[in-house]
Structure formats: structure tokens, C-alpha cells
Amino acid sequence: MLRLLRFSINQWDQEVFELNPSPDPKAIWQTVLATAYQEYTAAKNSDRSHRDGVVVTPVEIVDFQVRALKDSLAAQGATLADPRVEILDPFGGTGIYCARIMQLSGLTPDELDDLYHYRLRMIEIDPIACQIADANLKTVFEEETGRPPRRSIVICTNTFTIPTGMEKPHV
């Protein structure tokens, strides 16, 4: 896997610096993580990769979605700090979407703590992706708040088989 990661980093560096001489290192790291996982999955089990559609959503698209979410909330007089806002990523992969929400939220550490522990969840069926996402999201949370998270927000299950009422983890 290290070999794939090294290839991904070199390939990404070349492409990113051609497009943007001063890229966001947090965005680069999310892309490297997701691309390495995608390449690992394709190399390990190409049938699964094609069947299940293991594809990385580019960080630029995720960032657009996060900005659109924030704009939509602002138009309704709310922010990501609003306790009525709950976010569920049903096909979380390596956690890019939740990570970028935390990184782009503009929330205080206390507001981000509340969002992370009580209103932000991610579901993924692949146990390896769940482990990567869990480590990724815990690291991002600690970088953004300066404190370690109290629990995981990653749920390892099939999104299509969740019984009603089970989409919220018990705290």
C-alpha cells in the first residue's frame, strides 16, 4: 500500500502545482488519502471496485457542496452550529465530506465539538475504509479543535439495510 500512496502523492503533487501554485494542504491530504484507498481497492479487488463504484469525489466538488450547504443554511438564518442541523454521509468512504465540513465550517472549537459528537455521522460498508475514515476524522477534529474526540462518528454498515431509527449512533 505504501507504494500506491507514494505514487499517488507524486502524481497529485505534479497535477496540483500545475493548477494552483499555493494549494490548500488540508485539501491535498484528503485527496491523497482517498486516491490511495481507491487505488488500493482497485488493485486488491477490481471486481468489487467496479461493482460497488469505489470512486473518489474530488475535493473541489466536496468543497463546493460544503460552501453551498453553508450558503443555504445562511439563507435560512442558520449555520452549522445550529442544533437543528444534522449531517449524515451515507457513503462516507475515507471521510472526505465530513473532514471538509469540519475544516471549512468556520465554527469555534466548542461549536465543532457539538457538531462532531452529536450531529455529524458517516456510514460506510467497507471496514478498511471505515478504519481510514475514523483515523482521518479524529485527526481532523483534533487539528481543528485542539482536543481529542470522545468517540467515533463512523458507522460500519450497509446504508441500504439500516432499520428505521438506527441511523443515529447511541452516545
Question: What positions do the PLM features span?
Answer:
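SAM-dependent methyltransferase catalytic region
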Residues: 1-171
